[in-house]
Amino acid sequence: MITNKLRRTLIVGALVSASVLAGCVSQEKYNKLNDAYVKLQQAYQGDEVEIKQLQGELKVTIKDKILFPEGGFRLDAKAQAVLAKMVPTLSGFQNTKIVVRGYTDSVPIGADLKREGVTTNLDLSSKRADNVVDFLLKKGVSANLISAQGMGESNPVASNNTPDGRAQNRRIEVTLVGPGN
């Protein structure tokens, strides 16, 4: 029979152990994301790519003009070369969610895109994110880890009232979230 004093000691010990283990996992996650940050900074040196290490995640933002022709969603050879730079880093993760989000400005969809079945900015951003994911999958990034989301004109990072603001809002974000191994 376990006494109350022994029971309290065991509970406190279990809580301390859990806290220590959680700290180790957090430090390991931080180290893995930091290593990825350094590798991506080196890979994209001089490119129009922004890499940010945030609380428990790593975000790579690529301006759409690097990846897509204006109003388009297909990746050309230059775009594929830009995306290929992140493949070695992304392929090193086994237990980390990789979310590819496409964003647009608020300019209405033109007639050319409508003829291709793209009727809204949400459709356009979804096709862009899907094409990035398809490319990364073909290059060996695990299908179990990666997903695509079209965000349309939601979550602008700048005003859509100026050409520069609209250009900033047209982007792809690749975010790594999760345990980091």
Residue ranges and their predicted role:
Residues 25-28:
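Bacterial signal peptide processing site
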Residues 20-23:
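C-terminal motif of bacterial Sec signal peptides marking the signal peptidase cleavage site
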Residues 1-14:
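Bacterial N-terminal signal peptides that target proteins for export
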Residues 39-46, 71-102, 106-108, 133-137, ...:
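Periplasmic peptidoglycan-binding/anchoring modules of Gram-negative envelope and division proteins
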Residues 44-47, 55-57, 63, 85, ...:
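Extracytoplasmic
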Residues 55-84, 104-121:
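Short, solvent-exposed beta-strand/turn patches at coil↔beta or beta↔helix junctions
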Residues 73, 103-181:
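Periplasmic OmpA-like peptidoglycan-binding domain that tethers envelope proteins to the cell wall
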